[in-house]
Amino acid sequence: MEKECLHEIKNMENAVVFSSKTGNTKQLADEIRNVLPEETIKYFGSPETAPLDADCYYVGFWTDKGHCNAEIGTFLKKIKDKEVFLFGTAGFGGDTEYFDKILKKVEKNLDRSNILRGSYMCQGKMPNSVRERYMKMKNSPLPVPNIDAMIENFDRAVSHPDEQDLEPVSYTHLRAHETELH
């Protein structure tokens, strides 16, 4: 299956379009770029200048309030009759169910004419300002539910995306499973 899919990729013009606030999503985009045959990459960069005439789009986002960031949401709505692979990062991690909910929301931005080739998400580190805000919340006179769990999650996220996060993105997009959007 992977050989067939790789053959298809070699005969396509691919665009890797992403937005990365903290560098996490760019790490995933770089990994995808390294796996794709160089001669097939028509575009690599932000959605502002991305062409709309590639055959296959690898679209990366950072998570904003349980959804993709706005500029990627807008870009996804412009893509028609294309093959799409979604990838993203979220500061809150360790929960596949949470990632699946985000991906389902992001998929809703895609026109039904597109074919979703696959998707992948992993945890990403957050800016230190987030931890500082959590500590202020913890030390405030008003109790904040789950603040200790939020701080623990922040501390776990510091090393992500790591090698274990990057490895699957290299192979996940090569899957031959295609899901038509309904």
Predicted stretch roles:
Residues E13-E31:
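N-terminal beta1-alpha1 ligand-phosphate binding loop
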Residues D148-H160:
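Short glycine/proline- and acidic residue-enriched helix-loop micro-motifs
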Residues G45-R133:
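Helix-loop-strand module that forms the ligand-binding subsite of alpha/beta enzymes
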Residues R133-P145:
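Oxidoreductase cofactor-interface core, primarily capturing Rossmann-like NAD(P)-dependent enzymes
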Residues E31-E39:
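A short, Lys/Arg-enriched amphipathic alpha-helix followed by its capping loop at the start of a domain
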Residues A29, D162-L174:
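Short, amphipathic alpha-helical "lid/cap" segments that border enzyme active or binding sites
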Residues H173, E178-H182:
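Single conserved hydrophobic/aromatic residue that forms the stacking wall/gate
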